Amino acid sequence: MSANAAWDDSDSENENVVVEEKPVILPRARQPSIAKSLEKVQILENSVAGSEKNASDDDSDASSVMSDDLESLGETTEVLNFSLEQLSMMKKNLAQFPCSYKNIISEFADVEIFLISIDSLIVECAAHSYHNWDVAGQSMVLNKQIDRFLQQFVDIGGRFKLVVFSDLTTQFAKDTTLSFARSTALAHLANGPHARDLLFFTNPTDPEWDKLLNDLTPSFLMISTDNVTQNVCASQEIDLTKQFETIAFDVLTRSMSVVLLHSIKVNFVSVEAYYIQPLLVVAPDWQAFLAAHWDNNGTLLRNHLSKEIKFNQFETPADLWVKVITDAKATGKGSDTFDTLAAAVILSSLICSRRGAHRIYYPTRTDAKRGLNVIRDRRLILNAAVVLLDKADHANSKLDLSDLWDGRMVYSIFDELSANETVLPYRLQDDFAKYHQKAGLTVPLATDTNEKLFDPIPEITDPLVDLPILYSVTSPMIKRFVPEIEKMTSQNAVEEGTVQDYADYLKDTSQWRLKPIEETYAQKEEKIEDAWQLKKANRSKQFLMRWYELFANSLEGRGSNLLVDFSRVPKGYAVVEEEVTDEKKTGKGGWSGQKQQKPGAGGKKGATKESGKSKKDLILEANKKAKDQKVAESEKVKIKYGCQQGKESVIFLNNLYSSLDLPETRALCVYEIAVREGRTIFDQHQGTDKQEVRRNAAIDLVGHLKDCFVKHWDHLESKQKEQIVDLWVSLGFEAPAGSKPSSEAKQKKLNLGINMVYYQLQYGGELIDIQSDPKKDDRVSGFAPDGWQRKMLDSVDRGNSALIIAPTSAGKTFVSYYCIEKVLRSSDNDVVVYVAPSKALINQVCGSVYARFRNKSMKRGISLFGTLTQEYSQNAMQCQVLITVPECLQELMLSRTPAVQKFVSHIKYVVFDEVHSIGASEESHIWEQLLLLIQCPFLALSATIGNANKLHEWLNSSEQAKSAGKRKVELINYGERYSELELSILNINDPHGEDDGAVHKKAGERAVIPLMPYGVYMPEKLRMFSIPEDQQLTARQVLHLYNMMAEVDDATKKEFEPCKFFGQHGTKAVWISRSELRRLENALKERFMEWLSSDEQKINSILKILKEPVNTQLSYRARPFNKEKIANDYIVTLVDDLKEKGELPAICFNDDRHVCEKLAVTLANELERRELEYMETDEFKNKYMIKDESKLVKLAKRKRDDAEKKKKGDKDEDAGPEKDDDEMDVLAMKKAKLARALERFKLRGRNGGDPDIYAKMVERMQKGAKTRESTQVLLKLFERGIGYHHAGLNTVERGAVEVLFRSGNLAVLFSTSTLSLGVNMPCKTVMFGVDTLQLTPLLYRQMSGRAGRRGFDHSGNVIFMSIPTSKVRRLLTASLSNLQGNPPFTVLFLLRLFAYVHQQDILNEEGQKVSTMKQRAFAAKSLLEHSFSIHTRREAQDGILQKQLRMFSAFSFQLLRHLQLLSPFGEGKNFAEMAIHSSSGANGTLLFIYLMQKKCFHQLIKSYDTAEQAQLGILEVLANLFTNLRMTPFHERSDNLENVQVTLRGLPSLLKPYVEEYNSTVTGLYKRFMAASSQDGNLFDPSFAVSGKLDSESVSLTEDFLVAPLFDQYSHDESFLPVIDFNKKDHRGRKIQRNAFAYDFYVHGSRNMLMDVNGLHVSVAWFLLHDFAAILERLAIGVHNMARPQDPLVLVLEELHKNYDEKFRKAFGMRTRD
C-alpha cells in the first residue's frame, strides 16, 4: 500500500479509466461545450439500484468505472407495457420486474408497515416436509409455524397487517384438509395477539383493498405465487397460483414491492429475501383481466365477518368438538365408523389439552382398518368445524385454538378402538363420559388403567456426553467461559498425536514452509538511497503539507483560530466531586500546571473569591484596561468604516460583528445594523399595502433589536437606547417600561400588525432562543461550548467513556479533538485512534487534526497522524493520532505481530464516530467487537437512535466489567437542532399526463410547496408507530397545527392559545424560548394523539386540511413515474428559485452516480445556453462586448511603457496620484465589467467564493486533466459553480469539490451518500433528488442534517424532488431506528481471538512484556460475555442465548482442533495464519483449507492435461466456495449457451466425498452443541416433533425452511454454521440455483454478457467481481507463504489471480497493474 495514497495527487491504480468515445444523445438540439466533454464520460456504476455490496456508496477510489454506451449504464426500464394477451402469461410478466435476493430489513424494521398474505403463508407453511398430512395434519404444527414466523418480525421491530381474500375460500374448499387447516389458522390468529392486524377482503378488486393500500402505503406485500403441494393435497382441481399471481401483479402496478414467501432468512440484524421492485405499468385491460380471475363472492366475505357463533360458550377444545360432532351427526351422512372416529376426536382433544406438546402416541398398527368410510367421516367432521370456525365471534373468548386438531393422535386412538384395545385413561373417564353423552355417541370405550397415553416422555440423553468427535481442551480461558467442557465425552475422542499432522505431511512430501504472513503496514519502509528519488519524496511531502493546510483551512473556516498552542497550559478540568479532596493536592487528572474545577463550571476566571489584590495584579489590571482602550478605538474605527459602505454596510457590519472582542463595540455594531435595517424598511416597505412584505423583511431587524434589549442594553448610550425604543415602537409594539418613545415613533409607520408571540411563531422562528447555556470554557478556544458540550469535556477529564447522542450538526464532534489534545499534551508516545465509517470522513478528520495540532513538536520518526484503510496506509505505526476504519482497527487489536502489539499498547483513547453504524452497515458486528475489545476509555458519537438507553446500558455494563468498576460510560443525550428545518415538495405537473415539450419545466408560480409533516400522516400508521420522537416542528408549523386544531375544537382553541399558554402579553418584548415552543408542541401532539383514539373524525378533518396544500403533488407521486426524468426536467427551475430566494448553497442527494452527473450537466448546460443567448442581445453588444481587442492590448502596452518611463525619471511633485493598473488598462477594466455582467449565469455559495482557493484547486486538478475525463468535466462545471461528488472520483477530485463547496465557489452540489456520514459540508438547502432503495429514514435524517448548519444558517430547507409519496411518508413518519445486537462471533473470528490470546508473550526493547496472556484473556472475556445481543434479543431473557453462545464457542474450538488450526491450549498452528489472512472468504476459507490439507487440489490439478484446464477447474471450485449469489426464482436455464454455466454446476466429483465428509462432521457437531443450548437438550421444538417426521440425523440445517423446526429460543444466524451446501434446497424441496458469474466472466471476459446472460446489474457485477478478485489475491498470497514457490497449487492460484485481475480491469476500462 502506498504511504501517501490518502493525499497523493497522483491517481490510484484503479482511477484512470480509458474508454471508447461514443456520443451521448442529449434531449436538446444544441449542446453547449460542457456536454461535449461528457461524451466520453458516463459512470458505469449505479451504486444503489440493486447494489447489495455497498448501499452507502463507499468512497473507494478503486470503484471508478466508465461506460461504453448508455445501455451499459444498467438502467432499468421505467415503463412496462402489457396487452390483454400478454396478461395471461403472468409468470413471464412478473419476471420482467427487477428481482434480487437482498437484505430487506431497512424496508420495514421500525419504519414501515408491510402486508402478509395469510392465505399464501398457510400454503407455504403447509409445504414443509415435517408436516404429517397423511393424518390430515396437526393444528399445533401449522399454528406454531405461523406464530414463529410472525414473532421473528416483531422481535426486530416489524409492524404488519395480515390480509385474507375471502374469494380464495372456494379454492381451499376443494380439499377438506386444506380448508380446515386454513380455517383453524385464521381462527387461531383471530383469537390471538394479532387479531387487530387480521383484515378480510373479497379480492383485489374490493374497494376496501384499494383504500387500505392508499391509507397505509405499505412497504411491500409478502406473498408466494406457488400452488399447494401434492403432499398436502393431491387434487388437481386446486390451483391457487393464478389468484396469487394476480394479487402480486396488482400490487406491483400500484407502486408497491413484493417479497416472495420462500427462502426468507431472518438473522440477527438482517432479513434476506427475494425482493421484487415495482415499475410503471401500462395495462389498459388489467382491471377487466383481474375481475375475470376472481369470483367477487360477497357472501364468503360476509360469512367471515358475520361472527354469528359466540366462541366464549366453549371453555375447552373438547366443548367445541362436541358442537362440531353434533352438527355433523345431524346431517345424517355419517357411516358406521362415525361414532368411533368422533370418540377418538374428543379423547384426542382431552389428551392434547392435558399434555400439551409433550405427548406420546400409540405405535402405528400394521393391521389398521381405515377405509373410505373413515375418510368420508373425517371430511364430514372437519367440514362442520370449518363452518363454525368461519363464523366464530372470539370476543371474550379464552378458548385456545392453537392445538385444535391432532390427526396423528386421532388416528392412533381410532386404530386402537377399531382393534378393541383399551384406550381411555382412567383419569379422563369422567370428563370423557360427559362429552360422550353431549355428543350423543353410542360407541363404548374401555378404561385403560395403565394410562398408556399418559406415559412419561423418554428422557433425552445429554447431547454433550456422546459427541461424534472430541478433541482435548487445555485452555484455561475457554474452560472458564464454557464450564460444560468438563462433562463432554465421546466414543471417538481423539488423543493428541494419534492423527496425522497435515502441515508436517505437506512439509515432508511437498516441501511446504509455512512462513508467517505479516501485515504490510507493519513492514519497515525501505530507506531511499537514490538522491533524485529522495528529492522527489521531499517535494511530495512539501506539497502534501501545503495541501493539508489548504484543505484544513477550508474545512474549519477559521484558519489558525483553532490552532492549539502547546506552550499554553489549559485552565480548568473536571473531576468527580467526591474525589476532589485528594486530587486537589496532587493535581491528578489534569495536564501539568492545570487548575481543577467542578464539572461543567466552564473554567471561568474569577470564580474563586480573592482576599485582596497584589501590586502585580493592579499593574496587570491597568495594562489590560489600556489594552482594551486601544482595542476599543481600533474596533470603533472598523465600525465607522463599515457605516460608510453604503448599501453594503449591513453586510459588512454583520461580518465584522463576530470578530469584535469588547462588549461596548459589539453593542455599537448591533445598534448601527439595526438603525440601517430600520431605515431600509422605512424607505422600501412603508404602507399598509406592504404589511406582509414588511413582516418578512423585518425579521433581521427584530432580531437585532432583541440583541440590543437582551445582550447589549447596558453598553448602549442614552440616545442610542432612545432610537432603539423608537424603532421598536414604530413596528407596533409597546415601549419598554420607563422609556419614552418619540411622537413620530408612536405613529407606527412600520406597524407589523401582529403581536410578538405570533410574530415569532409565524415569521421569526429564528428569533426563538435555543437556551443551550453557552459559556466560555478555558479548555477550548474559538467558541463558547454549550452546557451539554461541557459535559462531554468533563467526561474526558474524568477519564470516563461517553456515549454522545445528538442530531446531525449539533456539535458533538469537537469533543474528540479535545480528547486528542489531552493525549497529545500528556505524552509523546500515547495514541488516540479515530474510527470513521468511511474514507470521505477519514480525509476530513485528517484535515481537522492537522488544522488544530500541527504545531506540536513530534519525536523523530513519529508523525502527528496516520491513516489506515484496507487499500492504503500512511504512517500507521508511527503516529500519535491514527485515523482508520473498523476492519483495520480490529486487525490491529488482534494482531500477533510484535510491532503492532507494541503500537496497540500505547492506545489511550478511541473515538468511534457515527457509532450508530453498529446496526446499519455490513461491518456492524466489527463495531460491536471493537467496543468490547478495547481496554481504554472511548467516545462513541452517534446520531439519534430509538433505544439509546439500551445501548448505554450495554456499553456501561461492559465498561465497568473491563475496568473493574473504575470507569463508567456517561450518556450525553441532546435532541435539539440548532437550525429549524423547513420542508417542501417540488411542484411538478402530472408526470402521467401529456408532455408539453418544454425542456425545463415549471408547474405554476411556485417552484416548491411547503410541506407540513403531519400532512402525510395516516390514522392507522399513527396508531402503529405514533409520531416519531425526534420529529420537531418549526415554530411556523406549531402555529399552523394549533390553528388547524383550534378550528375543530373550541377547548383546544382556548387552552392552547399561544399568548395564554406562554403567559405573556404579545405586544411587549416577549421572547419565546425553544423549550417553551417544545412545551406547546408536545401539548398539541398529546391532544392530537388523544383524538386518534377518542375522536377520529377530528383527526381526519385536521389531516385533510394539513394535506390539502400538497394533496395534488402526493397524488401525482402515488403512482410509479419516471423519477430521473422528473428530476432532470425541473432541476433548472428549482435552482433558479433557490437562487432568487437566497437559499443557496444546496446539496442534491442521489444515490446514483449517473443521476448526479446528469443533473449537474443539465443545470450547467442551461446556464451556458442563457449566457450565449445573452451575448447575442443588443444590450450585451453595446455595453460589454470587447471590440478591437488587439488595439486595446497595444494601448495598454503603450500606457505601461509610459508609466515605466515616468518611474525612471524624476517624479513631478505637482503631478496627481498614480493611477491603478486597471485604470490605465482599459482592456482589463472592460474584462472586469464583462465578468461582473456574466456573473448572473454562474452560481455562487456563501460569500461569493474565494478566487485564490479556486485558482489553486483548478491548478491542482489540471495536472490530471489530460488523462482523466471526469476532471475536465468537473472543471467545466466549476466555472458555473456546480459540482458532483461520488465514489467514482479520485482523491484529488473529491478534495477539490469539498474545498470549493466549503469556500463558496460552488453553490450546487450533486452527491451520493458519500457526504451523508459526518462530512462537514454546510449548506442552506438539501434536496432529495431521485429515490432509491437505500434512502432509509436514518440516512434521510443524516442527509437532511446538512441543511442549516450551526454558525451558518438560522434555518435550513429540505426539498423532496422525485420521491414517491410512499417514500415521503416513510421518511417523515418512521420511528427512530432501534439498534439490534449482532451475532457476536463466527468460527473464523474465534480462531483469530483464540490465537491472539494464547500466543507467546512479546517483550519490548526494555525486556518488559508488551501484553500478558492474562491481559489478553481478560480482553477476550469481555467480548465473549458481553455481547450487545444479550441486551436486545428475547432469547437472552431466560439465559438461552448466553448458553448458545457458550456452546458455539465450544463447538468452534472443537472444529478448529479438527481442522488442526488450534492446539489444545488454543494457540494458532499450521494453516491458522492463512485462515486468518483469508477470513473474508468466511465458510469457504475453512473448506478450502480442509481440502488443501487433504491435497485435493493437487489431485485435481493432476487430473487435467493443460495449465488452462487446471485453472478453469480450480476456478470452478473457488466459484463454488466463495460466491453465493442466488438466481431469481423466475430464471429459466438456456441450453443454447456455450462455455458458460450461468448457474453453478457444483464441485467436481473428485472433491464431493471430501466435502460430504466435512459437512457431515461439522453439522453433526453443531447439532449436538446447539441441542445442548436448549432447556431440555432437544434440538427440535416439541410442537414440531409431534408430527413424527423429525429426525436429528436426517433433517438438514442448511435447508431454506420458512420456519425451522428447531427449539423455540434458538437464535438463528446464517454465519453460525460454517458449511456450504452445494445442493441447497428450499422448504418445497426445490434446489436453489447459484449464479456462476465468477466462472463465466473468466471464460468470456465481458461485462455485457454478465448483464445479458447472468442477469446482473452492472454495478452489482463490478462489486462482485472486485470481491472475488480480492479473495483470489488473498488465497494466492496465503498459499504462497505456506507452500514452496514452485508448488503446482501456488502456480495455478497466482496465474489465475493475475489473469482474472487483468480481465476484470480490461472489461471495466481500469488501468492494469504494473
Swiss-Prot record:
<feature type="region of interest" description="Disordered">
    <location>
        <begin position="47"/>
        <end position="70"/>
    </location>
</feature>
<feature type="region of interest" description="Disordered">
    <location>
        <begin position="584"/>
        <end position="616"/>
    </location>
</feature>
<feature type="compositionally biased region" description="Basic and acidic residues">
    <location>
        <begin position="607"/>
        <end position="616"/>
    </location>
</feature>
<feature type="domain" description="Helicase C-terminal">
    <location>
        <begin position="1237"/>
        <end position="1391"/>
    </location>
</feature>
<feature type="domain" description="Helicase ATP-binding">
    <location>
        <begin position="793"/>
        <end position="963"/>
    </location>
</feature>
<dbReference type="InterPro" id="IPR052431">
    <property type="entry name" value="SKI2_subfamily_helicases"/>
</dbReference>
<keyword id="KW-0067">ATP-binding</keyword>
<feature type="binding site">
    <location>
        <begin position="806"/>
        <end position="813"/>
    </location>
    <ligand>
        <name>ATP</name>
    </ligand>
</feature>
<dbReference type="GO" id="GO:0005634">
    <property type="term" value="C:nucleus"/>
</dbReference>
<dbReference type="GO" id="GO:0004386">
    <property type="term" value="F:helicase activity"/>
</dbReference>
<feature type="compositionally biased region" description="Basic and acidic residues">
    <location>
        <begin position="1199"/>
        <end position="1218"/>
    </location>
</feature>
<dbReference type="InterPro" id="IPR027417">
    <property type="entry name" value="P-loop_NTPase"/>
</dbReference>
<dbReference type="Pfam" id="PF00271">
    <property type="entry name" value="Helicase_C"/>
</dbReference>
<dbReference type="GO" id="GO:0005524">
    <property type="term" value="F:ATP binding"/>
</dbReference>
<dbReference type="GO" id="GO:0003676">
    <property type="term" value="F:nucleic acid binding"/>
</dbReference>
<keyword id="KW-0378">Hydrolase</keyword>
<dbReference type="InterPro" id="IPR055124">
    <property type="entry name" value="PIN-like_DDX60"/>
</dbReference>
<dbReference type="Pfam" id="PF23002">
    <property type="entry name" value="PIN-like_DDX60"/>
</dbReference>
<dbReference type="InterPro" id="IPR001650">
    <property type="entry name" value="Helicase_C-like"/>
</dbReference>
<comment type="similarity">
    <text>Belongs to the helicase family. SKI2 subfamily.</text>
</comment>
<keyword id="KW-0547">Nucleotide-binding</keyword>
<dbReference type="InterPro" id="IPR011545">
    <property type="entry name" value="DEAD/DEAH_box_helicase_dom"/>
</dbReference>
<keyword id="KW-0347">Helicase</keyword>
<feature type="binding site">
    <location>
        <begin position="607"/>
        <end position="614"/>
    </location>
    <ligand>
        <name>ATP</name>
    </ligand>
</feature>
<keyword id="KW-0539">Nucleus</keyword>
<dbReference type="GO" id="GO:0005737">
    <property type="term" value="C:cytoplasm"/>
</dbReference>
<protein>
    <recommendedName>
        <fullName>Uncharacterized helicase C28H8.3</fullName>
        <ecNumber>3.6.4.-</ecNumber>
    </recommendedName>
</protein>
<dbReference type="GO" id="GO:0016787">
    <property type="term" value="F:hydrolase activity"/>
</dbReference>
<feature type="region of interest" description="Disordered">
    <location>
        <begin position="1197"/>
        <end position="1223"/>
    </location>
</feature>
<dbReference type="InterPro" id="IPR014001">
    <property type="entry name" value="Helicase_ATP-bd"/>
</dbReference>
<feature type="short sequence motif" description="DEVH box">
    <location>
        <begin position="913"/>
        <end position="916"/>
    </location>
</feature>
<dbReference type="Pfam" id="PF00270">
    <property type="entry name" value="DEAD"/>
</dbReference>
